[in-house]
A protein has these predicted regions:
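Short, highly charged C-terminal tails/helix-capping segments
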Residues: 48, 161-169
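Beta-strand/loop substructures that line and gate deep hydrophobic ligand-binding cavities in soluble
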Residues: 84-91, 97-153
Length: 169
């Protein structure tokens, strides 16, 4: 894994505006039954989602590819501001949540040393919410590796979940 420092590199950022109040977007992002519906790019599923959503808590996810490969991710929560912000660290793991280096999985992943993932939920008024996800990888690397495309596909899936929640409200 290549490491760079936080201040010297432009980080991956994806944003999306949802036609729903911030509380619904937050719910879609933080409730495991909804996370299972959107985790992973288009065509991927998330058959396992164990979430302890609190500062110091952990999220363990299995992301299953269309051809059946199961990859695991873990997330540790460092800061949670209700309906506003989540600061976390995401990493590749085994099914028990133990950290696995990307190279062990045959994955090239460039992380910025000391960078956390930050997800911001901004109330735009008029029932709209802007979600901004700042990743721990350099923008250029995220574009080249497909991470950027994957996160945009994830946000498409989040939009579908949010639309369902808004309709049910």
């Amino acid at each position: 894994m290549t490491e760079n420092t936080v201040s010297e590199i432009e980080r991956m950022v994806v944003t999306r505006v949802f036609d729903a109040p911030r509380e619904l977007v937050w719910k879609a992002w933080t409730d495991p039954k909804y996370v299972m519906q959107w985790w992973g790019p288009k065509g991927f599923t998330a058959p396992v989602c164990q979430m302890d959503f609190r500062v110091g808590g952990k999220l363990l996810l299995c992301m299953k590819t269309p051809d059946g490969y199961e990859g695991w991710n873990a997330v540790e929560y460092h800061e949670i501001v209700l309906h506003e912000k989540i600061v976390s660290s995401m990493y590749f793991s085994d099914s028990e949540g133990n950290r696995v280096e990307p190279a062990q999985l045959g994955i090239e992943h460039e992380a910025i040393d000391g960078a956390h993932d930050v997800t911001i939920f901004e109330d735009l008024g008029n029932g709209q919410t802007k979600l901004t996800h700042i990743g721990n990888e350099p923008m250029e690397s995220a574009k080249n590796s497909g991470q950027m495309e994957g996160w945009n596909q994830i946000l498409d899936k989040v939009a579908a979940v949010v639309a369902e929640l808004a309709q049910a409200k």
